[in-house]
Amino acid sequence: MRIKKGDSVLVTTGKDAGKKGKVLRVIPDKNRVVIEGVNRVKKHQKPSRSLPQGGILKIETPLNASNVMLVCSRCNKPTRIAHKIMENGEKVRICKQCGEALD
Protein backbone atom coordinates (compact mmCIF):
# COMPACT_ATOMS: atom_id res chain seq x y z
CA MET A 1 0.00 0.00 0.00
CA ARG A 2 1.16 3.54 -0.69
CA ILE A 3 -0.02 4.88 2.69
CA LYS A 4 1.57 3.91 6.00
CA LYS A 5 0.72 4.36 9.67
CA GLY A 6 1.70 7.83 10.90
CA ASP A 7 1.43 9.53 7.47
CA SER A 8 -0.36 12.86 7.15
CA VAL A 9 -3.20 12.61 4.62
CA LEU A 10 -5.96 14.72 3.06
CA VAL A 11 -9.45 13.28 2.46
CA THR A 12 -10.47 13.93 -1.17
CA THR A 13 -14.08 12.65 -1.30
CA GLY A 14 -17.08 12.08 0.92
CA LYS A 15 -18.59 13.99 3.83
CA ASP A 16 -15.13 14.76 5.29
CA ALA A 17 -13.56 15.99 2.03
CA GLY A 18 -10.84 18.57 2.63
CA LYS A 19 -9.98 17.44 6.16
CA LYS A 20 -6.41 16.57 7.08
CA GLY A 21 -5.43 13.93 9.61
CA LYS A 22 -2.88 11.38 10.72
CA VAL A 23 -3.23 7.71 9.77
CA LEU A 24 -3.89 5.65 12.90
CA ARG A 25 -4.25 2.21 11.31
CA VAL A 26 -3.85 0.61 7.89
CA ILE A 27 -5.89 -2.44 6.78
CA PRO A 28 -4.08 -3.59 3.59
CA ASP A 29 -6.20 -6.67 2.77
CA LYS A 30 -9.32 -4.44 2.60
CA ASN A 31 -7.45 -1.39 1.18
CA ARG A 32 -8.69 0.81 4.03
CA VAL A 33 -7.20 3.37 6.43
CA VAL A 34 -8.36 4.83 9.76
CA ILE A 35 -7.63 8.56 10.09
CA GLU A 36 -7.58 10.58 13.30
CA GLY A 37 -10.68 12.81 13.63
CA VAL A 38 -12.16 11.81 10.25
CA ASN A 39 -15.21 9.66 9.38
CA ARG A 40 -16.47 9.59 12.97
CA VAL A 41 -19.70 7.75 13.77
CA LYS A 42 -21.71 7.34 16.95
CA LYS A 43 -21.64 3.87 18.48
CA HIS A 44 -24.14 2.88 21.15
CA GLN A 45 -22.18 0.93 23.77
CA LYS A 46 -23.84 -1.33 26.33
CA PRO A 47 -22.45 -1.20 29.87
CA SER A 48 -19.58 -3.65 30.35
CA ARG A 49 -16.69 -4.23 32.75
CA SER A 50 -14.38 -1.95 30.78
CA LEU A 51 -17.07 0.75 30.36
CA PRO A 52 -19.50 0.34 33.30
CA GLN A 53 -21.57 3.39 32.39
CA GLY A 54 -22.08 2.54 28.71
CA GLY A 55 -23.35 5.36 26.50
CA ILE A 56 -22.79 6.81 23.05
CA LEU A 57 -19.17 6.86 21.83
CA LYS A 58 -17.72 8.59 18.77
CA ILE A 59 -15.30 6.31 16.94
CA GLU A 60 -13.30 6.64 13.71
CA THR A 61 -14.26 4.13 11.03
CA PRO A 62 -12.11 3.03 8.07
CA LEU A 63 -12.07 4.89 4.74
CA ASN A 64 -11.06 3.46 1.40
CA ALA A 65 -7.40 4.29 0.72
CA SER A 66 -8.28 5.61 -2.75
CA ASN A 67 -10.23 8.47 -1.12
CA VAL A 68 -7.16 10.00 0.55
CA MET A 69 -3.99 11.70 -0.72
CA LEU A 70 -0.66 11.79 1.05
CA VAL A 71 0.48 15.24 2.25
CA CYS A 72 4.21 15.85 1.72
CA SER A 73 6.00 16.92 4.91
CA ARG A 74 8.39 19.22 3.00
CA CYS A 75 6.13 21.10 0.56
CA ASN A 76 2.95 20.61 2.67
CA LYS A 77 0.83 19.84 -0.43
CA PRO A 78 -1.34 16.81 -1.20
CA THR A 79 0.60 14.70 -3.66
CA ARG A 80 0.76 11.45 -5.54
CA ILE A 81 3.81 9.34 -4.83
CA ALA A 82 6.38 7.45 -6.86
CA HIS A 83 8.61 4.61 -5.75
CA LYS A 84 12.35 4.67 -6.33
CA ILE A 85 15.02 2.08 -5.52
CA MET A 86 18.11 3.71 -4.04
CA GLU A 87 21.73 2.60 -4.65
CA ASN A 88 21.73 0.56 -1.42
CA GLY A 89 18.66 -1.40 -2.62
CA GLU A 90 16.17 0.37 -0.35
CA LYS A 91 12.74 1.18 -1.84
CA VAL A 92 11.71 4.79 -1.04
CA ARG A 93 8.50 6.77 -1.61
CA ILE A 94 9.08 10.04 -3.52
CA CYS A 95 6.83 13.15 -3.57
CA LYS A 96 5.79 13.94 -7.17
CA GLN A 97 5.44 17.67 -6.34
CA CYS A 98 8.91 18.42 -4.95
CA GLY A 99 10.91 15.20 -5.50
CA GLU A 100 11.70 14.74 -1.78
CA ALA A 101 11.92 11.26 -0.22
CA LEU A 102 9.04 10.62 2.20
CA ASP A 103 10.47 7.69 4.18
UniProtKB/Swiss-Prot annotation:
Highest taxon above the source species: Bacteria
Family matches, as Gene3D superfamilies: 2.30.30.30
Listed GO MF terms: rRNA binding; structural constituent of ribosome
InterPro entries: KOW, Rib_uL2_dom2, Ribosomal_uL24, Ribosomal_uL24_KOW, Translation_prot_SH3-like_sf
Family annotation (Pfam families): KOW (PF00467), ribosomal_L24 (PF17136)
Assigned GO CC terms: ribonucleoprotein complex; ribosome
Biological process terms in GO annotation: translation
Key words, A-Z: Ribonucleoprotein, Ribosomal protein, RNA-binding, rRNA-binding
Keyword Ribosomal protein found: yes
SMART domains recorded: KOW
Function of the molecule: One of two assembly initiator proteins, it binds directly to the 5'-end of the 23S rRNA, where it nucleates assembly of the 50S subunit.
Stated family: Belongs to the universal ribosomal protein uL24 family.
Binding partners and assembly: Part of the 50S ribosomal subunit.
PANTHER family: MITOCHONDRIAL RIBOSOMAL PROTEIN L24 (PTHR12903)
Protein name: Large ribosomal subunit protein uL24
Organism: Syntrophomonas wolfei subsp. wolfei (strain DSM 2245B / Goettingen)
